[in-house]
């Protein structure tokens, strides 16, 4: 079996390995986990979803807006009851909230967006509850296909304390990693470098620090949230995601030839 844990230092992993062996009599090994990417948008768009196979009908118009970093997903209804009955509006809101919506760059989870119901249509005879689920999901996807999507990756906030002799090496490493950093004085001959950098490249840096400082350097890492990915094209190519082929998250609408 597999258990996923947040990335830890080598010493912590060794302690955990010993504890598991002592308590449960099990020998375990640790492998490098994968980075969890997310997606958002950087411009406002309107997405339209229409679902009208024979004897079914629903149409949903959604406004997709970028949110503040770390704000997560927010959903609202700003639709007149003259356009769409309140019960149908509540149903659309429920369908927005119930699903983990996926982006169109890599199929990763969406975050830091506001999605607002602004209009919709129902049929007095043919509309069923499931029709609005289909129309809602398709409206989200259709909007995303129009938007300027942004791939996000997790970042660490870091603090590195090293002897002055190793500052040049550390700064070169952080520049190579695409990290933003500042330097400040510490006690004696030591210097503290603080900043933020991608988890994907800085997560295993402790081993390098130990090697070039001969065990005297101290690196502290803390999660700092998600930031725009530093190597977007490379990650997108690796995922090879094609939104038009994702049958679980369709991007198109469904119309009935000749009407319902």
Question: How would you label these PLM feature ranges?
Answer:
Residues 1-260:
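Accessory interaction regions appended to the cores of large information-processing enzymes
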């Amino acid at each position: 079996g597999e258990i996923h844990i947040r990335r830890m230092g080598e010493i912590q992993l060794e302690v955990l390995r010993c504890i598991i062996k002592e308590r449960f009599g099990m020998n375990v090994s640790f492998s490098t986990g994968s980075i969890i990417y997310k997606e958002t948008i950087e411009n406002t768009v309107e997405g339209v979803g229409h679902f009208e196979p024979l004897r079914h009908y629903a149409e949903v118009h959604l406004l997709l807006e970028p949110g503040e970093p770390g704000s997560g997903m927010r959903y609202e209804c700003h639709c007149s009851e003259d356009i769409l009955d309140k019960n149908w509006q509540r149903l659309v809101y429920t369908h927005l909230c119930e699903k983990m919506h996926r982006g169109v760059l890599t199929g990763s989870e969406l975050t830091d967006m506001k999605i607002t119901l602004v209009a919709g249509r129902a049929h007095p005879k043919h509309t069923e509850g499931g029709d609005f689920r289909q129309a809602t999901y398709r409206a989200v996807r259709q909007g995303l296909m129009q938007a300027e999507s942004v791939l996000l990756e997790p970042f660490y906030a870091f603090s590195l304390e090293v002897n002055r002799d190793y500052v040049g090496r550390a700064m070169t490493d952080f520049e190579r990693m695409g990290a933003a950093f500042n330097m400040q004085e510490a006690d004696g001959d030591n210097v503290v470098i603080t900043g933020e950098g991608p988890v994907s490249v800085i997560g295993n840096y402790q081993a390098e620090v130990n090697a070039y400082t001969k065990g005297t350097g101290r690196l502290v890492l803390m999660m700092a949230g998600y930031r725009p990915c530093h190597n977007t094209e490379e990650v997108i190519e690796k995922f090879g995601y094609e939104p038009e082929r994702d049958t679980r998250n369709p991007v198109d609408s469904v119309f009935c030839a000749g009407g319902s």
